[in-house]
Amino acid sequence: MHEMGIALQIAEIAKSAIPKTPADLKVKAVNLRVGKLTAIVPDSLRFCFEIVAKDTPLAEAELNIEEIPIVAVCKECYTETIITDADFSCEKCKSGKLDIISGRELTVSSIEVADPEEMKQAQKKSKKEK
């Protein structure tokens, strides 16, 4: 399962990208773009991320994954094809001579940080409920 190593890297990237102050800053979401060719299982990655995010500013963050399809351009007829199964061939001319133009991505596209005012209000609300 390579998802654990990837989750560790995502957590490190996210933690290094957020400001150090205020100390109680919370991350709401980490948004990823993941290509189908990476062979990442989204549910496994979310599970691993939850483990590595524990006791960090990422602990309550949602891991949003946008799956990027495998797209190739035929070297014979220049048709752009979305690859949906193991048959890596041009949908128009059936050639197997393709250049992959997307599907290998693994990118942290954005990180959403909780608004400090929202955090204060949520803390006040939780104190009142106790």
Curated annotation (Swiss-Prot):
User: What's a Pfam family in this record?
Assistant: HypA
Please state which protein family the record places this protein in.
Belongs to the HypA/HybF family.
Q: Where does Ni(2+) bind?
A: H2
Quote the record's binding site residues for Zn(2+). C74, C77, C90, C93
Keywords of this protein's UniProt record, alphabetized? Metal-binding, Nickel, Zinc
KW Zinc (keyword) present: yes
UniProt protein name: Hydrogenase maturation factor HypA
Protein origin, superkingdom: Bacteria
Q: Which GO terms describe its molecular function?
A: nickel cation binding; zinc ion binding
Does the keyword field hold Zinc?
yes
| GO-annotated biological processes | protein maturation; protein modification process
Job description of the protein: Involved in the maturation of [NiFe] hydrogenases. Required for nickel insertion into the metal center of the hydrogenase.
Instruction: Quote the PANTHER family the UniProt record gives.
Output: HYDROGENASE MATURATION FACTOR HYPA
